[in-house]
Amino acid sequence: MSFGTRHDPVRQVALMFVFDPRITALPIVGCEDRFPVRRVYCVGRNYVAHIREMKEGDERDPPFFFQKPADAVVAGGVDISYPPQTDDFQFEAELVVAIGAEAVDISVERALDVVFGYAVGVDLTRRDRQRESFKTGLPWEVGKAFDQSAPCGAIHPVAGVGHRLTGAISLSVNGVERQRGDLNQMIWNTPEIIANLSKSYRLQAGDLIMTGTPAGVGPIVPGDRLIVSVEGLTPLAFSIVGKES
């Protein structure tokens, strides 16, 4: 499959903007080009053990999705500032799927055809704010969709690593392992996620999908060093620093 959108939004015309538009992009392993991020979709409650530790939802529930802004994505190696308005800042290790072609209501059988590659990511969460939103029934972007809330490693093209349907996923804080699972423990696997998501959204090249986290999520504080790994992919490492003034 040739990756790219059916209708290229980039035209060879002179455009003037009131300010330079910011493009969030991630490095690609083995390539000097970068992967421009269009949208970030996240799958909620996709590992049984995580559902049980959070005491929310049911493993028989259909998949549900939320989003983070594209500029919440931070490339590996960049320090993450402890965010404001929280006393319970938590990590969630995730496999990230990078979409390379358009998909609308695609079948499970064809879903992997639109995958450009895979990366390691973390869904950073203001857990106390998220729980407040659950209690009030208000939207929970404040707990999930804030600045620097989606650290992501370099993208490995499928041509180099194949499809990541099984393999260990883990996260350590200051050298102590806090999360460990296997991608085959997902309730909804990658092709099922893509097929379900494409029923509600027109997926396009540049989209990222964070596929859920295994059990073991927990708090982090300034000074902590996180290393996140998915078998066969480049690990993601970053440190938590003090709140921005």
What is the role of each PLM region?
Residues V13-F35, N46, H50-E59, A119, ...:
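Catalytic-pocket segment enriched in acidic/His residues
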Residues V13-V115:
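Extended, compositionally biased flexible segments
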